[in-house]
Amino acid sequence: MSWFWVFVGFCLLIVLHEAGHFFAAKATGMRVERFFLFFGPTIWSVKRGETEYGVKSIPLGGYVKITGMNPEEDVPPEVAHRSYYRQDVWKRIVVVAAGPAVNIVLAFAILFGVYWANGREEIQQSVGAVRSGTPAAKVLQPGDRIVAVDGNRYAGLSTEERLVKFGETVASHRCDGKQVDGCVAKAPVQLQVRRDGQVKTLTVYPRYDEEAKRALVGFSYGSVNQPVGAGAAAKEAGDAIWEVAKGTAHVFSHLFEAEQREQVSGVVGISDVGHQVIEEGLERALLLLAFVSLSLGLVNLLPILPLDGGHIFWSLVEKVRGRPVSLRVMERATAVGIALVLMLFFLGLSNDIGRITGEGFEVR
């Protein structure tokens, strides 16, 4: 059943994205010929007014067809004044930007609602969960409060900063020789914990985790939710969006670095995560929906054709030059853009396969 809701969420984000383009085009007087979910052969369609609405068979996105999006398109004289390329540059930018804008606004609305309803999550210095089969499973219990790691208490730091230091101390314990997945550190970590009012010193040997790229003990910290007002919830949502935007920009500006290429995920990976998260509860599912919507909006703003950001970029170039960009330049830019989009698609697919099977297309 969770896979069904992953599919529904995916369809919802596509429909809302395309609806942004659709309503903006209508509002600026453009003629919309088609509004379709998915690509490929048509499964179902109906025409209402001048627009055909429908569903196609390949679930890889959706599209809104506006008259005159292609400068070489044959447009009937009676509707030529409503074609895309006959409109002012600002109108074209509004229409193209409306799709990503809807995704970003939706992400903000969901994050705001979740933060306002549930409060701000504050990390605790106590053990929240212990992963089975890990070194921690033999010595730690949920509720144990971590007092010190290797004798280091890191007094004077905030809880978040202290826990980062604890993690760095654990990660400093390395295997003897090459760091491979599952290898055991040559020296143990001394954990001081408070349990039932008593302080105990526990000895545990961390194991290297290939996915995390560091040695881990195998537990997560607990957290509590502190109530917040509407203003604080809005700030939390805005901060989260800003952090994701910075992270997205960093990944795409450093794609030639192996570590950053590994951060790219595709439809398979997102679906797999969605399937797992939905089973964890509504709040986690809503947060995932928000961040996928945000990512969809941000990635579409990349300044490459045929993405929305590419159309915005070349519209701005036209505005600066004072005349349209030649069709030859646009065709070359589109060819390069499609190549980049395909590269990102296969990179994401390779990473997804690697995460699921341990293998990939060896592009990392």
Per-region residue spans from a language model:
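Transmembrane alpha-helix interface/packing and boundary motifs in multi-pass membrane proteins
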Residues: 254-258, 293-307
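Residue-level signature of transmembrane alpha-helical entry/exit and packing/kink sites
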Residues: 2, 6, 87-96, 284-288
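Hydrophobic membrane-targeting alpha-helices
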Residues: 109, 113-117, 297, 301, ...
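Membrane interface segments of multi-pass transport proteins and intramembrane proteases
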Residues: 44-47, 126-131, 315-332, 361-363
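PDZ peptide-recognition modules
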Residues: 74-90, 98, 102-268, 358-364
